Amino acid sequence: MSRNFYNYDPTVDILQPPLIPDVILKSNLKELTLPTGNQVLESLPLTAWFHRTRSNIISHLTRYEAEWETQKSAARNELHSVKSYLKGNIFNDARELYALPETNILTICAYFAGRIITNRKNWGVSAATLQSVKSSVHRPSLMARVCTSIPSKMVLPWAMAGAVFKELAPTAFDNTITSLESDILDPGFVAQYKTLWRDYYTNGAKKASIEAAELLEGKLQGYIGFARNFIIYSTR
């Protein structure tokens, strides 16, 4: 008996076109024959969509990469400008620049010390909530109330940090104030606060304290001189 019992010839089936209408085949599909004899159908709209999507992705990636490189270059230039400005206008003292790490560490420690001082829990203020109603309620002292007030919380940590930085790096501190006044703050605001500083501090509180110290020193010297003369005349 023949192997092709139903008169089936596989070569004829391979060479026959697929069972697809000619309209669809001519408009949306493309038929390709591989070297092995297999037939492949390519969807032209799907291929066009893949090409279009691939081109858009490549275009977006190229644009984002160029923008990223531009931003990196701009950030690098800004960082270089900031370093040059700080080195030329703020930290222009070689001794202070050499000791800058220690100065920064101590300044940060002073800031956190101010935060600790202005924390209510460190003064025992919150202990009253843990006590019963019948027991005596813990009342904070005047110093605790002053240190834990809202103005103290806002000013004291920065004031302590500024005092330490001014003590360890006076030139850099003065240069920082000068740079803030000339490059960042408004000239009208600078002139106004300088006038207030001169009227109320330089010619006011500071002058009064200097005069009081000189008066007290003169009085003490007079009393010491009187006591010394009294002792001298008494021992004769």
Curated annotation (Swiss-Prot):
The chain crosses the membrane at residues 97-113, 146-165. It comes from the Eukaryota. Signal peptide: none annotated. Belongs to the apolipoprotein O/MICOS complex subunit Mic27 family. It is found in: Mitochondrion inner membrane. One of its GO terms (biological process) is protein-containing complex organization. Residues 114-145 are mitochondrial matrix. It is a multi-pass membrane protein. GO terms for cellular component: MICOS complex; mitochondrial crista junction. The keyword Chaperone does not apply. The keyword Electron transport does not apply. Component of the mitochondrial contact site and cristae organizing system (MICOS) complex. This is MICOS complex subunit MIC27. Keywords: Membrane, Mitochondrion, Mitochondrion inner membrane, Transmembrane, Transmembrane helix. Residues 1-96, 166-236 are mitochondrial intermembrane. Component of the MICOS complex, a large protein complex of the mitochondrial inner membrane that plays crucial roles in the maintenance of crista junctions, inner membrane architecture, and formation of contact sites to the outer membrane.
